[in-house]
A protein has these predicted regions:
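Phosphopantetheine-dependent thiolation modules in NRPS/PKS and related acyl-activating systems
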Residues: 1-39, 43-85
Length: 85
């Protein structure tokens, strides 16, 4: 894993999901919902807030927080990378 944003996002996801919900092979393609981290809407809010704090960015624009952007660890990391650019 060479993407530092992805590494930090994966750490946040692991913290929010808890050890019992972290997939064994978690990576960029791991879904945030079903068949992945199994995050619900409250968990997703916690992830978004943690990412805002960790990366010192705002993720408040509903046009950015699309279903596609929140589909996987990698898509969330890509959104964050765009915000940091």
């Amino acid at each position: 894993m060479t993407d530092p944003a992805l590494a930090r996002v994966l750490a946040i996801l692991s913290g929010v999901a808890g050890a019992d919900r972290v997939p064994r092979e978690a990576g960029a393609d791991t879904p945030l919902g079903e068949n992945g981290y199994w995050l619900d809407s409250v968990d997703m809010l916690e992830v978004i807030l943690a990412c805002e704090h960790e990366f010192d960015i705002s993720l408040a624009d509903p046009d950015e927080l699309t279903e596609e952007a929140l589909a996987s660890a990698g898509s969330l990391a890509a959104l964050i990378a765009r915000k940091l650019a």
